[in-house]
């Protein structure tokens, strides 16, 4: 698919080529975008407010709320789904519930908590739990996640990386945008030798045009501001010690 637009292009007016072929191939595809900012705590009556024009929100926020509201499938979880949920329980044992358009987190036998009373990092993990539990994320689906590491306790980054690797292995295509060294390296460490994980770096050349670089290993990226900053910190730390 090809798309052409400029700063003057109005919404939905971009020039698109080969759209029909693309739509036919992707007609049965389930995809979800998780923004860097957690939104479920603000879900109450948001759809109605947007439709009435009282507030303006990016459509991606409305999409993720709609995906999270999908009823949790009845019956026994599949073996793959059980594996995912077991990993997430290392971070949070709570389960997501929806009541009167409000999201709650119910930790074990404790009383349910409104989402806005829960730490933002745990809200993001709870959202992931919900998307796995209700079948939004399963084999053949696509996940776009902007800065998964944001507001996550650093000690849980390895758990998050392990879950992403498992989802990828089971057939979920994942696109992650990150500025975090630890998440990038843990994904590299935990992946298998036959993994299809690739690292992509977007940068501007001398003409200020956006270029793309792809590598199988994180440190093989020539345009890698994450590694550059990490090395700079290491040199400065050594300088302080010496």
Role assignments for model-derived ranges:
Residues 1-140, 205-242:
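Phosphate-coordinating catalytic segments in nucleotide- and nucleic-acid-processing enzymes
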Residues 123-126, 158, 162:
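Short, contiguous clusters of charged residues that form electrostatic/catalytic patches at enzyme active sites
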Residues 142-144:
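Walker B motif beta-strand of ABC-family P-loop ATPases
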Residues 146-148:
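Walker B catalytic acidic pair
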Residues 153-154:
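Conserved D-loop-proximal element of ABC-family nucleotide-binding domains
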Residues 159-242:
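C-terminal lobe/lid and adjacent interdomain/linker elements of RecA-like ASCE P-loop ATPase modules
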């Amino acid at each position: 698919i090809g798309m052409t637009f400029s700063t003057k292009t109005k919404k939905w007016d971009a020039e698109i080529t080969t759209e029909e072929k693309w739509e036919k191939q992707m007609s049965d595809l389930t995809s979800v975008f998780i923004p860097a900012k957690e939104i479920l705590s603000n879900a109450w009556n948001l759809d109605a407010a947007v439709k009435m024009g009282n507030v303006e929100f990016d459509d991606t926020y409305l999409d993720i709320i709609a995906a999270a509201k999908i009823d949790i499938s009845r019956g026994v979880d599949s073996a793959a789904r059980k594996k995912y949920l077991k990993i997430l329980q290392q971070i949070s044992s709570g389960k997501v519930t929806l009541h009167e358009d409000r999201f709650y987190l119910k930790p074990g036998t404790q009383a349910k908590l409104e989402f806005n009373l829960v730490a933002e990092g745990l809200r993001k993990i709870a959202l992931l739990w919900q998307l796995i539990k209700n079948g939004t994320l399963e084999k053949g689906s696509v996940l776009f996640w902007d800065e998964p590491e944001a507001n996550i306790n650093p000690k849980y980054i390895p758990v998050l990386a392990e879950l992403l690797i498992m989802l990828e292995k089971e057939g979920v295509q994942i696109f992650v945008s990150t500025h975090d060294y630890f998440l990038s390296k843990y994904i590299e460490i935990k992946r298998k030798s036959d993994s299809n994980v690739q690292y992509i770096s977007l940068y501007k050349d001398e003409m200020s045009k956006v270029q793309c670089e792809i590598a199988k290993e994180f440190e093989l990226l020539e345009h890698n501001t994450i590694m550059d900053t990490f090395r700079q910190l290491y040199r400065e730390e050594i300088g302080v010690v010496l």
